[in-house]
Amino acid sequence: MPITVFDTKGIPATRRERIEAAVVAAGRQLTAPHEAWIAADPFRGGFKVLITGPHGFERTVTFALDDEAAVIADRVWQTLEE
C-alpha cells in the first residue's frame, strides 16, 4: 500500500472510512511509499489531505465534506502526478 493514512482528525465517523479508502485507492499505482494525514477544515466546511513522500514531496489538497469518493481519489491522484 503506497499511501498510508496516519491520522484522521475531526471527520465524522460516517465519512471517515470512505475518505480514507479514496485516498489510499488514489495511490495504488505509486512505486514509492507516501504518507497522508486527513483533518477537518472548519473554516471552509470541508477537510484537507496532507500528502508527503520521498525527496521532500509535500502537497495539501482541500475538499468539501460531501465530495464523492471518486472525486477525492481523482484529485489526490492528480496531485501525486505533479
Explain the meaning of each model-derived region.
Residues 1-37, 70-82:
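Negatively charged, low-complexity tracts enriched in Asp/Glu with abundant Ser/Thr
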Residues 38, 52-54, 68:
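Residue-level signal for the start and early helices of compact helical domains
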Residues 39-43:
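Short beta-strand micro-motifs enriched in acidic
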Residues 44-56:
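Amphipathic beta-strand/beta-sheet edge segments enriched in Tyr/Trp
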Residues 58-65:
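A short, exposed loop/beta-hairpin motif centered on an aromatic-Gly-Thr core
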